[in-house]
């Protein structure tokens, strides 16, 4: 699988003339890139409108990721991934549906971003695991917050009701001053709010044991859980399911965040300075608060 690359238009407003076709291509590809586009903020908002991601009122998150902070915050492991395959903000009641990512700066160290279509993996599920997944609720730990996992498990219990969880001293990438997060258990399989496609909505460890912690709590902790997570990790490890993109400065990526999980890995030695910065703009389901 490959990330689909679109031609960089001299006048990005031309996209609005064939927005219906572009949206169809996007929902088929799930991840598209405009290489070294040089698009400014106004032009990125034209992309948003052309692909139907939302409006000014729907823009819910706008933030930067400094990869140096992330790299230094994670202990060196026996593998090349600096974070496991994950879905964005999977603990929220309304997780992000669409996103525009722009690599605003890029240093000497090489790296790649990886993507996997979780809707495609749902279609590959064996019948017994598909039945299990469609009837199971899970709770994702709020990403980037240092959490007492044993206490978190006790708070979750076996209820699928939402709850508030206190957080202290957010890790790099967190939100300073935030005292708690609202956590929502959700079905393991959900329908995409735009396309209606069924999607496996989970975060998992890859390789197994990454961080030494499990980032997902299954409310159905039967033997089927082990069968399901074993199958899922095997599929996530399969290169045939992975799409990889070598980042460069000025690259703009449009991503179906509801359907696609992602990861990051380094190819070369890490840099001496924090020069690799990714600007994120995420949109939720229209009307979701």
Show where each model-derived region lies.
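Non-heme Fe(II) oxygenase catalytic core, chiefly the N-lobe of the double-stranded beta-helix
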Residues: 2-249, 258-289
């Amino acid at each position: 699988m490959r990330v689909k690359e679109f031609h960089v238009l001299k006048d990005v407003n031309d996209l609005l003339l064939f927005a219906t076709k572009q949206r169809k291509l996007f929902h088929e590809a799930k991840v598209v890139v405009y290489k070294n586009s040089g698009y400014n903020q106004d032009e990125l908002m034209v992309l948003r409108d052309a692909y139907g991601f939302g409006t000014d009122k729907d823009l819910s998150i706008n933030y930067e990721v400094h990869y140096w902070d992330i790299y230094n915050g994670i202990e060196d492991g026996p593998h090349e991934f600096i974070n496991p395959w994950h879905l964005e903000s999977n603990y929220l009641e309304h997780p992000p549906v669409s996103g525009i990512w722009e690599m605003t700066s890029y240093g000497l160290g090489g790296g790649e971003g990886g993507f996997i279509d979780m809707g495609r993996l749902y279609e590959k599920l064996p019948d017994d695991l598909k039945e299990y997944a469609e009837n199971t609720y899970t709770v994702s730990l709020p990403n980037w917050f240092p959490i007492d996992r044993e206490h978190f498990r006790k708070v979750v219990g076996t209820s699928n009701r939402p709850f508030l969880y206190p957080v202290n001293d957010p890790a790099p990438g967190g939100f300073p001053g935030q005292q708690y997060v609202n956590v929502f258990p959700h079905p393991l399989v959900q329908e995409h709010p735009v396309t209606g496609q069924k999607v496996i909505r989970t975060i998992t460890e890859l390789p197994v044991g990454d961080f030494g912690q499990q980032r997902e709590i299954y409310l159905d902790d039967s033997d089927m859980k082990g069968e399901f997570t074993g199958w899922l990790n095997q599929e996530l490890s399969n290169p045939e399911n992975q799409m990889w993109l070598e980042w460069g400065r000025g690259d703009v990526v449009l991503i179906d965040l509801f359907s696609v999980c992602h990861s990051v890995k380094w190819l070369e030695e890490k840099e001496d300075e924090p020069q690799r910065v990714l600007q994120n703009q995420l949109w939720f389901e229209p009307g979701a608060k």
